[in-house]
Amino acid sequence: MAAFTCTSRPPISLRSETRIVSSSPSASSLSSRRMFAVLPESSGLRIRLSLSPASLTSIHQPRVSRLRRAVVCEAQETTTDIQVVNDSTWDSLVLKATGPVVVDFWAPWCGPCKMIDPLVNDLAQHYTGKIKFYKLNTDESPNTPGQYGVRSIPTIMIFVGGEKKDTIIGAVPKTTLTSSLDKFLP
């Protein structure tokens, strides 16, 4: 499995600004206080800010706000356990394979492909030694999907002895994938 690490940018800087709402002497005690946070640039990280209970004091009391920050890494973990197949390796890896072969037709921009990716990875681990799993990027290898009539992705095809036996289109539940794969176990 690939390991991802997250790094954060320089810390957040805070500025406070006080403005007088009214210029009349009787209302001079009314002021508006604003907190500005200058956030660092972020690439794939979300910075969550939350106020501490001490900052939720009454409006009439002087406020001291303490800011607590947490950086959360939301990089989707991907695995490299599933071998990649392309137009040039298709015949040797899929058509000439002994036993059942599952090919996941996907693209990096496809949202449903990203949704089903963890399921396919789990199934590849579960069926290790029984079924071979491959991934084919339809953007990088457009000939093979065209040859097999792949019109939408994600599409999962099951091959046995070089022949297409089953096709599953779309992001389906794990139970649907499992029931389709179980039919082709040796």
UniProtKB/Swiss-Prot annotation:
Q: Which family does it belong to?
A: Belongs to the thioredoxin family. Plant M-type subfamily.
| Positions marked as site (Deprotonates C-terminal active site Cys) | D104
Q: According to the UniProt record, which cysteines are disulfide-bonded?
A: C110-C113
Q: How does it assemble?
A: Interacts with G6PD1 and G6PD4. Interacts with PGL3.
Localization in the cell: Plastid, Chloroplast stroma
Its recorded name reads: Thioredoxin M2, chloroplastic
Instruction: Give the CC-aspect GO terms.
Output: chloroplast; chloroplast stroma; chloroplast thylakoid membrane; cytosol; thylakoid
Residue(s) at site: Contributes to redox potential value: G111, P112
Give residue ranges for domain Thioredoxin.
Answer: 73-186
> Which is a Pfam family this sequence falls into?
Thioredoxin
**Function, please?**
Thiol-disulfide oxidoreductase that may participate in various redox reactions. May activate NADP-malate dehydrogenase.
This chain's source organism reads Arabidopsis thaliana (Mouse-ear cress)
Q: Which domain of life is it from?
A: Eukaryota
Q: What are the protein's GO molecular function terms?
A: enzyme activator activity; protein-disulfide reductase activity
Q: Where is the transit peptide?
A: 1-72
Which InterPro entries does the protein's record reference?
Answer: Thioredoxin, Thioredoxin-like_sf, Thioredoxin_CS, Thioredoxin_domain
Enzyme active site? C110, C113
Q: Supply the CDD domains for this chain.
A: TRX_family
Cite a single GO BP annotation. positive regulation of catalytic activity
Q: Which UniProt keywords apply?
A: Chloroplast, Disulfide bond, Electron transport, Plastid, Redox-active center, Transit peptide, Transport
Q: Does the keyword Transit peptide apply?
A: yes
